[in-house]
């Protein structure tokens, strides 16, 4: 009787293990489809005539999404399950260490990714990939600043664009839409402070723009 009970327990454990493995495989397959389709949409905007090159670029982009998720998941697991108890200062230090480790991993991954894309694409196409990975926020936001402030000097336009491009580099590595947009919000704050110090009133600029739209 005991042997039968043991055998049933073993079979039950094996069944649960197989079910968990199957669910994990299904989840991974679904994620692979999502990132491949996302990468395909980006590559579709690049005008690449060489099918093999298009596939290589697609795989680079999809691979970057996967590698970033692994870094983010590892970081979040450490932050969520391994926080040291007790002194809040120790907890903050631990959080900073975990985030710094993840950021260093992301930095290396980012540089490698851009270098590999640069070997396949023109600078203009590389920009398109970066915009595709960040919802096209740079060109949209830059156009908006030019609409609001038509009297910007060339130097001021360059400063606005430089800040947006820097934000884009960080946003490319962010894991969620909110995290990506947070990077742009941070840098838009810097831009607005810069423009305010140069004498521009952003609230008045919004009002002036609205007035220009009225017939």
Question: What do these predicted regions represent?
Answer:
Residues 18-215:
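Charge-rich (acidic/polar
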């Amino acid at each position: 009787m005991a042997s039968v009970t043991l055998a049933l327990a073993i079979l039950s454990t094996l069944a649960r293990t197989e079910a968990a493995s199957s669910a994990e495989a299904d989840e991974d397959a679904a994620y692979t489809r999502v990132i491949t389709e996302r990468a395909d949409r980006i590559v579709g905007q690049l005008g690449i005539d060489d099918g093999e090159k298009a596939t290589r670029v697609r795989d680079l982009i999809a691979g970057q999404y996967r590698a970033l998720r692994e870094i983010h998941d590892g970081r979040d697991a450490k932050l969520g399950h391994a926080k040291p108890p007790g002194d809040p200062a120790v907890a903050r230090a631990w959080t900073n260490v975990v985030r710094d480790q993840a950021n260093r991993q992301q930095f290396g991954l980012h540089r490698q990714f851009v270098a590999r894309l640069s070997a396949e694409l023109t600078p203009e196409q590389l920009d398109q990939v970066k915009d595709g990975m960040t919802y096209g926020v740079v060109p949209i936001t830059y156009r908006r600043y030019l609409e609001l402030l038509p009297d910007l000097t060339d130097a001021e336009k360059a400063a606005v664009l430089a800040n947006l491009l820097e934000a884009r580099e960080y946003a490319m590595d962010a894991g969620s839409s909110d995290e990506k947009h947070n990077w742009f919000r941070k840098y838009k704050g810097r831009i607005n402070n810069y423009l305010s110090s140069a004498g521009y009133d952003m609230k008045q600029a919004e009002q002036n723009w609205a007035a220009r739209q009225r017939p």
